[in-house]
Amino acid sequence: MKALMFGWEWPPHILGGLGPASYGIVRGVVNTGECDVTFVLPKPQGDEEKGFVHIIGAANTPVVWRDVDWNYVQQRFGYCMDPQEYYDLRNCIYADFSHLYTNDMGCIEFSGRYPKNLLEEINNYSIIAGVVARTEEFDIIHAHDWLTFPAGIHAKQVSGKPLCIHVHATDFDRSRGKVNPTVYSIEKNGMDNADCIMCVSEL
C-alpha cells in the first residue's frame, strides 16, 4: 500500500507537537512493512530524516511552467529533491496559476512556519496537493490536523482515493472555547469530506 500524507511539520524543524506526532506515525506505519509513505511538507530544509519516507516540498513543487534546465534545478533544489521530480511535478500542473506570485522556478514560496498569512499558505498548500495528487501513485490520503485538511480534500477530489484525516486537536481544544469560525469551518469541512477520522483520544 502507498499513502500520500500531508503534514505541516517534520523533524528536526519542530514548532509544536505536529512534527514529532507525524514522524512517529509515519515511522510506525512504515515499520509494518506494508506501506510506503510520501509526505508533503510546506518547506523542507534538506536535513530532514528521509531514509524511510519520501518527502516532497510544497515550496519545490511548480504551479507555473518555467523553462529551466537540469543544472539550474539541481543548483536551486538539489539540497532536498532529485531534479527529475521537479520535471515530473511540472508536467502535472493542472490550471493557469500565473496570477499567483511564484518564484523563478514557478513555485509558491512557503514560510515553513505559522505566519500571519497562514490561511493563504493553507490555500496555496491545497493547490500544491492537486499537482502532487496528479503526479504520485497512492492508495490512501492521510491529512494531519486542520492545516492540511483542504489539501487532503483536494487530493481526494483529484484522485478519487479515500481520505483519512488525523485530528490531533480541534480549535475547541486549542482556544479554550474562543473558537475561530474560519478554523472551525475548515475542521468541519475536513470531517465532512473524510472517509475515516482518527483522533488522539476517545473523548
Regions found by a protein language model. Give the residues of each.
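Histidine-centered beta-alpha loop that forms part of the nucleotide-sugar donor binding/catalytic region
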Residues: 8, 42, 167-170
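A short, glycine/small-residue-rich beta-strand->loop->alpha-helix junction that serves as a flexible
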Residues: 9-21
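Short amphipathic alpha-helix
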Residues: 19-30
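A conserved catalytic-core segment of Leloir-type glycosyltransferases
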Residues: 28, 32-133
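Nucleotide-sugar donor phosphate/pyrophosphate-binding loop at the beta->alpha transition
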Residues: 121-128, 162-164, 172-189
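Active-site proximal beta-strand in glycosyltransferases
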Residues: 3, 140-142, 149, 153-174, ...
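Membrane-proximal helix-turn-helix segments that form the acceptor-binding/catalytic region
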Residues: 130-135, 157, 180-196
